[in-house]
Amino acid sequence: MEVIPKKYFLRTAKKYKKKHYDLSKVNKVVSLIEKEDFEQLYAKHKLGVIRGTHPPLYHVHVDRAYNDDWLLFYFGADNKIYLSALGDHNLIEHISKIFND
């Protein structure tokens, strides 16, 4: 599967990098998504779906040990994975607007 970061994801990743978050943990989660290892995504990263989005927009906790409020938002279409954003639980409320733009 091809992984494609959206512009908003790149902006939010830059913000988290400036805050000294370990972005290699994002890469580990993305590799689990690529491998379709849903068992580990559910158990370790609390994979969830945001209702009302089409195609379905998923969120996973990047690093629950360090910060349980650090989420990766993504969706899949046409055998590709689109990384939408990095954020927190407050972003879930606003993600429909960002996602549908």
Predicted regions span which residues?
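A short, surface-exposed loop/turn module that caps and links secondary-structure elements
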Residues: 35-65
